[in-house]
Every structure is written in C-alpha cells, then in structure tokens.
C-alpha cells in the first residue's frame, strides 16, 4: 500500500502550503472534525465548552492544538512511510492516555482532505487528494498496529 515517489511529492507539495499557516489550517480541521462528528469533542476536556463555530474560531487554545496536531502530522508525512520513530510516542499517548479510537483518526483524515481541498483547490486536485488519502490511510494502519501492540483496540 505504499505511495510512489510521485504520490509523496503531491502530498509534500500541498503540505508546504499547510506549513505556511499550520495553526489556521489546524483550527479549521478541528472545527470541521467537531462539527461533523460532535462525539469527538468529548475527548477534549479543554474544548468541551466550545459549543458554536464562533466559539471555536475565537479559541486560541484550539488554534494552538491545531498547530500541534499538524506539526506532528507533518513530521510523519515527511518521513514518506518510514515513520516508526515518530509514530511510537503518538500511538502511546493516543492509546493509553487519550484513548482515541482509530475511527476518530478516520474522521480527522476526512476533515484534513476537506479543508485542504477548500483552501487549496488548485494544488489539491484529484491526484493530490488520492495521494493524501493513501498517506493518511498508511498512517492509520500503522498507528492501529501500534495500538494493538499496546493492547488498545479502540
């Protein structure tokens, strides 16, 4: 299920656009996640009080967390599938501390694709979307394997 060099290039090209505004992209992605799947908000004690999109847009904490999420994802994507060292601590915290189900990672992947397409339609056409979907699927498959090693079947 690996990506070709060309597919990785498509992923990293659009990621360059994301890195120009990690916090803004991250905030948009989290808002899309929470609006589309409100149950995911329950995993975030510090965001549970954010009930409206306006509240979410005004939250500096949400923006900071969006930056954190996309910084970690960017480090993983740049490894082009050789991301074991980056994945291990992420899987550890998400499985044992936060207890984030794999399904929620599917939800955020959908939000990532949507936000990147809406913000960068010229750079994120069908080929780039397909490549990013494959990269995110690889990430989810590998993190699910780490979850299993940790005894978490979320």
From Swiss-Prot:
Task of the protein: Monomeric heme protein which primary function is to store oxygen and facilitate its diffusion within muscle tissues. Reversibly binds oxygen through a pentacoordinated heme iron and enables its timely and efficient release as needed during periods of heightened demand. Depending on the oxidative conditions of tissues and cells, and in addition to its ability to bind oxygen, it also has a nitrite reductase activity whereby it regulates the production of bioactive nitric oxide.
Main location class: cytoplasm
GO biological process, one term: removal of superoxide radicals
Cellular component terms per the entry's GO annotation: extracellular exosome; sarcoplasm
Chain sites annotated for binding heme b: 94
Residues where O2 binds: 65
Catalytic activity: Fe(III)-heme b-[protein] + nitric oxide + H2O = Fe(II)-heme b-[protein] + nitrite + 2 H(+); H2O2 + AH2 = A + 2 H2O
PANTHER family xrefs: MYOGLOBIN
Residue span(s) of domain Globin: 2-148
Protein's cellular compartments: Cytoplasm, Sarcoplasm
Keywords: Cytoplasm, Heme, Iron, Metal-binding, Muscle protein, Oxidoreductase, Oxygen transport, Phosphoprotein, Transport
One MF annotation (Gene Ontology) recorded for this entry: oxygen carrier activity
Matches recorded under SUPFAM superfamilies: Globin-like (SSF46458)
Binding sites annotated in the UniProt record for nitrite: 65
Subunit structure as annotated in this protein's UniProt entry: Monomeric.
This enzyme's EC code(s): 1.7.-.-, 1.11.1.-
EC class name: oxidoreductase
Protein name as annotated: Myoglobin
Sequence similarity: Belongs to the globin family.
Positions of modified residues (Phosphoserine): 4
InterPro entries linked to this entry: Globin (IPR000971), Globin-like_sf (IPR009050), Myoglobin (IPR002335)
């Amino acid at each position: 299920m690996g990506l070709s060099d060309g597919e990785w290039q498509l992923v990293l090209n659009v990621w360059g656009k994301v890195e120009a505004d990690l916090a803004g992209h991250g905030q948009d992605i989290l808002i899309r996640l929470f609006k589309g799947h409100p149950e995911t908000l329950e995993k975030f004690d510090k965001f549970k009080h954010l009930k409206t999109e306006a509240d979410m847009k005004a939250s500096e904490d949400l923006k900071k967390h969006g930056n954190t999420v996309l910084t970690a994802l960017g480090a993983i994507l740049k490894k082009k599938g050789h991301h074991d060292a980056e994945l291990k601590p992420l899987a550890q915290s998400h499985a044992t501390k936060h207890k984030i189900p794999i399904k929620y990672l599917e939800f955020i992947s959908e939000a990532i694709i949507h936000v990147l397409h809406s913000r960068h339609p010229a750079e994120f056409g069908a080929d780039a979307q397909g490549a990013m979907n494959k990269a995110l699927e690889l990430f989810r498959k590998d993190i699910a394997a780490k979850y299993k090693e940790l005894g978490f079947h979320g």
